Regions:
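Structured alpha/beta reader/binder surfaces that contact nucleic acids or chromatin modification marks
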Residues: 2-184
Length: 184
């Protein structure tokens, strides 16, 4: 088990943890370096990030951000079963049933610094007990990946059953079809 975190909006992490979302989009943070973003880690903890504007950028009826304190609750672990770059806005938009982002957010990410976006299909696991990390300066900044300390002992269980997961993966494969560029 890698001890790395993928920084994602808190509301998206929650949707992944409830089984309401099964993919993540990423263009890359400012601090991604010369090579830009890639899903270089195929297994990672979901590291929630907090900013109030995310409430208006998701398609859920009632979105409340938890209070931001000194601790960060790590509640989910993910395995990227598919990771690719999509160069077709039509395909990126067609993935709407698999995520909670507003359509304009997908278009914005797709068009930022050139067309195309990275997407990963995930198998998400709830970890028990939740892992509480103290918020540290090293976790800040516009980058996707953060190194975490060694995780404590924990149990993991998939957030969706195997049959549902297989259906979601088949839908992802159908929607992306031959428009794939594997993410290295």
């Amino acid at each position: 088990m890698e001890s790395v975190g993928f920084k994602e909006w808190s509301l998206v992490c929650d949707a992944l943890g409830r089984g309401e979302q099964s993919i993540i989009f990423r263009k890359g943070g400012i601090a991604e370096g010369r090579e830009g973003f890639s899903f270089r880690h195929r297994e990672f903890f979901l590291f929630p990030t907090f900013f109030h504007e995310q409430v208006a950028k998701v398609r859920i009826a009632s979105a409340n951000l938890p209070g931001v304190g000194d601790g960060i609750a790590i509640r989910w672990y993910a395995k990227a079963e598919r990771a690719l770059r999509i160069d077709s806005l039509r395909i990126a938009e067609a993935l709407a049933p698999l995520h909670i982002l507003m359509p304009d957010v997908v278009r914005e990410r797709f068009g930022y610094k050139g067309e195309g976006v990275h997407v990963a299909f995930l198998r998400v696991f709830e970890i028990s007990p939740s892992w509480i990390l103290q918020n540290e300066k090293r976790f800040a900044g516009c980058r996707s990946w953060v190194d975490l300390p060694s995780p404590p002992g924990m149990k993991m269980r998939p957030v969706v059953n195997d049959a549902t997961h297989q259906q979601l993966r088949a839908e992802f494969d159908r929607l992306t079809g031959s428009f794939l560029t594997p993410d290295s």
